[in-house]
Amino acid sequence: MEQSREAYWLRYPSTSPLKLRWRALTVRHCFHVLPGESILELGAGSGLWTEHLTGVLRGENPITAAVFNEDLMSAATRKKLPNTRFVRVTDLAADLPAASFDYVVGTVILCHDRYAENLAALYRLLKPGGQLLFFEANYWNPQVLLKNIIRPFGRWTGDARCHVGMRKFKLMKIASHQGFTHIEVIPYDILHPLTPRALVPFVQSTAFILEHAPLVRELCGTLYIWLQKPGDRETRRPSISLATRRELFGSTSFVVPCHNEEMNIARLVEALVGFYGEYIHEIIIVNDNSTDRTAEVTRDIAAREPRVKLIDRQPPNGVGLALRDGYAAATGRYILTMDCDFVHILPEFRDLFEVVAEGRDGAIGSRFSHESVLINYPFFKIVCNRAFHLLVKLLLLPGVRDVSNNLKLYRADILKNLRIEEPHFAANAETGLKPLLAGYDIKEVPISWINRTVEMGSSSFKIAGVAPRYFLALLRMIWGAWRGHRGFSQQVSGTKTAGRAVDAFAREALDKSDQPKSPAAIWRKDTLS
């Protein structure tokens, strides 16, 4: 099986590197891997995927790459990968120590008659709270189905033969019987290996929709199988600071609008201080007329952590109004705006800080980048988001992928001088689009998105109610831009503060370095009315 998998990757040079990188990124985003956490890769072969894992994880994690085939082992050992050890394994139970790994990953490992036995061996290898992520052939993919039914077809395609149909519910039952919890079996990877190189970007752009569309998703070539061993994962994770850029120490105001978030605030603040304590100038919790104990919980936290500040808003409520008040109160050099339920993806924030440390004006956490990962994202929300951004691309900014997410790290003056007109969720589109239209140098950074779990409470975002406001906000911005000028980007040399591309209608707003900061410095009323 290991040799067949190796031959498969080498057979499709136009798509295999992309698929291998996607899988490495999925490991990183699903687990939110912290530096120092240990990874076991099963069936590493010559190390083709190991190279991508090492690169995506920055060489910060000890990787044990288990090779089954002796010939491939000699090829693997010639690779000099940082923090990686190749080992020959013939017996999972005997050759690897128990409870040694935070994560176990692999491709086409369970797809044979002994996968129940192997699940038991893998359970033994994981630490309490450890997780497993495997990529297996999707039995209901037409090519895989034909390959199993018509053996000559399987030999002609050259794929590794799947000895047992990976029936989703059967697998979930066996995994549960072995003791695993949080079992996810999800169709994955709509990109066919024979896709012409010229069509790959198009397939990438539509993959988010196709991989989440009912029925269509069942045609994906792969399943990702995500399991967890019971145990308190959070307490065993390393206590490590991700704040490595000294120039950003004490620089950032974290602005968090909250509505009925008493279940999440304490965990969020604790995690922010643990991961990014050196960056924190202040954490501003904007209580947007909550009916639970959000304000009380925040006051209790602020009594112990002086950098936590509470803004207790009065009606009317709305995300846009909460953001406006939070930005006005912020005193840091940078403002990071986020939702309270982003606690699981905090390790990914380091990529945003890297962007501003490089000298850019800001960064946006993009859920729909080619390297993003979505987990249990509602299909209708994907369709609405993609329709909105298609209009943005056609009518305003061709290059954007996801500017409406409320995860943004900007220079503080950009947000303080930004005029937010939408009182509710559509303000997130304004905070993404208006600075870009004004010419600021802002980069989209791939992140993951995980749907709320039961312990995180319910979201107040209701797509049917907020979608029309997003499109109205877009129409308002299009009208303002078209009234201001007909061409969107002109190169203006020597305008570092404003970014590279500066629109004619925005120049007045950008020429403000020596002026007092005013809420109307960008997108003045006469531009939009």
Labelled PLM ranges:
Residues 142-144, 149, 156-157, 313-329, ...:
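Acceptor/aglycone-binding surface of glycosyltransferases and processive sugar-polymer synthases
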Residues 287-295, 342:
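A conserved acidic beta->alpha catalytic loop
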Residues 46-93:
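Class I SAM-dependent methyltransferase SAM/SAH-binding core
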Residues 1-32:
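Conserved class I S-adenosyl-L-methionine
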Residues 116-128:
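A short glycine-rich, Lys/Arg-flanked "PGG" loop and its adjoining helix->strand segment in the class I
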Residues 129-137:
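Conserved beta-strand signature within the Rossmann-like core of class I S-adenosyl-L-methionine
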